[in-house]
Amino acid sequence: MNLETKIPPPAICFICALLMYISTEVSALADILPRFPILLSVVLMVFGTALGVLGVWAFRRVRTTVNPFNTEQTEHFVSDGVYRFSRNPMYAGMGCWLVAWAGYLAHPLPWLFLAAFVVYMTRFQIMPEERVLAQKFGAEYESYCRRVRRWL
């Protein structure tokens, strides 16, 4: 299988988080946005972690691969548990972390990197995965895509 990217999604998330921080340090823009209360940031991070862990657990439960670069080894189609609410809970969890971080940084530029994360992951990770899953699981997967959102 030939995915458009070979960069692991957690690395993309980390790079975006790092760029978010750097952008606040080098920007001449003032911190014009209100900072998220620390409790809100923590809640979003816990929620994001839960999404990711539940997504991994659902894959492990049916013994299918969690490796985003080996989708051809996918043997089971998971549509229960957290996958009833999101087709990509692991990536949505990373997005929650970035929302928490951007809100905590209280600066407009980090939000651009959150948008870049969503666009990049959708184009270079999720869409290629979806093509493989549609090919492998056909009408069942297509029906699932009509019922469940890609992110949240």
PLM regions: where:
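Extended, alpha-helix-rich binding/interface surfaces that flank or overlap catalytic cores
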Residues: 88
